Amino acid sequence: MIRFTIFPRLLVLPGQKSNPYIQDFVSSLEQTGEAVVVNPPHKNPLFSLLPMKRWGDVFVFNWYENVPDYKYGPIQTVFALLLVLGAKMCGRKIVWVLHNKGPHRQEHVKQKRFLTRFIARHSDLILTHAREGIDLARRYDRRAEAKTCFLHHPTKNRLPKSRPTGPVMYDLLIWGQISRYKGVIEYVRYLRNNPCKGLRVCIVGACPSQSLAEEITRELTDTITFINRSPSFEELARYVEQSAFVLEPYKPESVLSSGTLMDSLSFGAKVIGPDTGSFKDYAQEKRLNVYTFRDYREIDEIVTRYRDCPVSWEGYRDFLEENSWPNFGRRVVELVKKC
């Protein structure tokens, strides 16, 4: 039985929402029957790893480079460095999951850059959910390419039992938490300045930044709907059914892979995203309807050209089952055995 420590395993209180990636990761490992996760959820997921009873044979670090953004960031940054060095000295394996090209928050840039290069150098295995991540890891450390492995971002099959037959209300659906790096305000401004496009757009997702929400609201036109709240997966399924495409207007500078992309595919959506990372990978995947853009004008062209292009339910189902969370857990365990 392989013992894993997964970071960050944050304690989620009742009524709170969090990124489900970590809990799904934990479950996928334990479902293999060959692994157990030894660190419980905690309100401080880094300092909670101080007791060695919470040290597994393998440490898996996600978003390690974001530690400087934490409360008491300088102290936690030093602890993060010492934790990796201590784990290596004790013969533990280090796995780093490379999620992004760079941190989305542009603060503590030097510390984050140092942590990124540090974890790339000291990892025994680097996992990335986009093929571009292999080249990126090599730029962080010239020896990293040999230990970097591409694994599809795991997902779930949420395809409806029957194909949607209702009317399409929106050309484009933008969903998920609204943050600066996702490029929503820039795209809304583009639409406002190009009213002849006439695209019907629905934006649904909680916007934690009141100033950003107000900026978006000021730029709305008659063809753009903004719903400032987080939808349930049941509601999201209906929005996807009512939309011709899901659009992710992310800024390409930081995005590498996207959970929103995978969740959209899990509902059978046609997806438009920037020509980078996993979007670029899946634009070449014949089973999927994923399209990429380099500038906003290309989004208009994609909508016009592919609006009536059918989705292969069989192709989507095959892709989703192939890249399920249980399969992901098995692949991770096998890779850890070899490193």
Per-range role (PLM):
Residues 165-183, 188-192, 201-204:
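Conserved donor-binding/catalytic core segment of Leloir-type glycosyltransferases
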Residues 294-301, 307-339:
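A charged, aromatic-enriched C-terminal amphipathic alpha-helix characteristic of glycosyltransferases
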Residues 121-159:
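Donor nucleotide-sugar binding/catalytic pocket of nucleotide-sugar-dependent glycosyltransferases
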Residues 200-214, 229:
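Glycosyltransferase donor-sugar binding loop
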Residues 213-234, 245:
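Nucleotide-activated donor-binding/catalytic signature segment of Leloir-type glycosyltransferases, i.e.
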Residues 248-262, 276, 280-281:
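Nucleotide-sugar-dependent
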Residues 240-255, 269:
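Acidic donor-binding loop of glycosyltransferase active sites
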